[in-house]
Amino acid sequence: MGIAHTEWESVIGLEVHVELNTESKLFSPARNHFGDEPNTNISPVCTGMPGSLPVLNKDAVRKAVLFGCAVEGDVALFSRFDRKSYFYPDSPRNFQITQYEHPIVRGGCIRAVVEGEEKTFELAQTHLEDDAGMLKHFGDFAGVDYNRAGVPLIEIVSKPCMFSAEDAVAYANALVSILGYIGISDCNMEEGSIRFDVNISVRPRGSRELRNKVEIKNMNSFTFMAQALEAEKRRQIEEYLSHPNEDPKKVVPAATYRWDPEKKKTVLMRLKERAEDYMYFVEPDLPVLQITETYIDEVRQTLPELPHSKYMRYITDFDIAEDLAMILVGDRHTAHFFETATMSCKNYRALSNWITVEFAGRCKAKGKTLPFTGILPEWVAQLVNFIDRGVITGKIAKEIADRMVSSFGESPEDILRRHPSLLPMTDDHALRAIVKEVVAQNTASVADYKNGKAKALGFLVGQIMKRTEGKAPPKRVNELLLAAMRDM
């Protein structure tokens, strides 16, 4: 990016549509379930049949209130539904029921760590609305599946408070974590149960103005989100630099774009509609939604410990690295796995590394995540304890981890019992002979160590471990090696 580009900054906000995991739809008794045969989970309300009337799903309201409490938002005692009018084949009523003027939650915040810095991102509002159906294309014709029509959504709208792609991705990750912890959505991007629309504008660095924003629709991966934001930032800056004397509103008009991952560029879909184009008006078939402070307090009491609080506790109580703590708390199942393991192992730093690095990598290669493999937390704790007590070496521990992931049903103790060849070298006489031989064959490295070059010791240890196939106890190797060099 050229010098001229560095004099500009992004201003980013996100609109996130989250499908709530209720049993039925927002305004009808039809089943809310992904993957069923087309048009099997429908009712007259879903398909806009004349005379059908909406009835609000109580569980969807509770889940929206729970989210509002989780993000410390202001849950409204009175909220209202509105009709958003537009014509599209996947919307059989020709309108969506949403909350335009009086949302169920205002404000709130999402806390995230961005490149080591803790940031707080403010929310504008969260509102309830129903989803549209899906168009499915089959060569020379298209079909409409109304199974998704009427599925309950919360739309979470942030303020324009992010200034980089890194901010946006960190915010999105933190939001997904919160939704997972409170259990109101499965957040499956591939199935569309969470969809990210990003709004971005650019301005000269140091300016406070908000220029026309461009919306990039339906980001279905965090990688694409980051790429799209960077590409759109460059596009807008280049437009402004190419037309310095023109009205900024005409240079970059408000519009909706999509991301083309193959061309690595944003592609125009349409110019932005105005609010009046949707002809919002109060939904006549639904009363005002009224809830009480007592109800809100009861819902708030069901909140679990949330990711940010858990993150701070892990750093303080367990003294583990911030980056590993972030990985652990990112998923509630992984966090639970770690905390269960800490009941059997007090080497928290090593434990966090084995869970987030060693086992996570091995499980990913198998297409699984550690908490859902059958490997018990106590087994990972046992593996770390074996290393700490000198029962096995680090190299042997990795071999055992390989076998644990291959079988998903054996503890380290079971594996050692079945494969005694994995046990470390216990013949001290043989180990002394190997140490003596390595020292004799590497006199230059011995001299380097005696002259203050600490790396030489690591080289000598490596030679010994190589000859013992990693089975020599590291502590004993160091003792014998230092003694042998003193005797020279």
Curated annotation (Swiss-Prot):
Organism: Chlamydia trachomatis serovar L2 (strain ATCC VR-902B / DSM 19102 / 434/Bu)
Protein name per Swiss-Prot or TrEMBL: Aspartyl/glutamyl-tRNA(Asn/Gln) amidotransferase subunit B
Gene Ontology molecular function: any one: glutaminyl-tRNA synthase (glutamine-hydrolyzing) activity
Keyword Magnesium assigned: no
Family membership: Belongs to the GatB/GatE family. GatB subfamily.
Pfam families in alphabetical order: GatB_N (PF02934), GatB_Yqey (PF02637)
NCBIfam families for the chain: gatB (TIGR00133), PRK05477.1-2 (NF004012), PRK05477.1-4 (NF004014)
Known EC number: 6.3.5.-
InterPro entries the record matches: Asn/Gln-tRNA_amidoTrfase_suB/E, Asn/Gln-tRNA_Trfase_suB/E_cat, Asn/Gln_amidotransferase, Asn/Gln_tRNA_amidoTrase-B-like, GatB, GatB_C_1, GatB_Yqey_C_2, Gln-tRNA_amidoTrfase_suB_CS
PROSITE patterns: GATB
Protein's job: Allows the formation of correctly charged Asn-tRNA(Asn) or Gln-tRNA(Gln) through the transamidation of misacylated Asp-tRNA(Asn) or Glu-tRNA(Gln) in organisms which lack either or both of asparaginyl-tRNA or glutaminyl-tRNA synthetases. The reaction takes place in the presence of glutamine and ATP through an activated phospho-Asp-tRNA(Asn) or phospho-Glu-tRNA(Gln).
SMART domains: GatB_Yqey
Keywords: ATP-binding, Ligase, Nucleotide-binding, Protein biosynthesis
Top class in the EC scheme: ligase
Gene name of the record: gatB
Keyword Secreted: no
Catalyses which reaction(s): L-glutamyl-tRNA(Gln) + L-glutamine + ATP + H2O = L-glutaminyl-tRNA(Gln) + L-glutamate + ADP + phosphate + H(+); L-aspartyl-tRNA(Asn) + L-glutamine + ATP + H2O = L-asparaginyl-tRNA(Asn) + L-glutamate + ADP + phosphate + 2 H(+)
Domain of life of the native organism: Bacteria
GO biological process: glutaminyl-tRNAGln biosynthesis via transamidation; translation
Assembly behavior: Heterotrimer of A, B and C subunits.
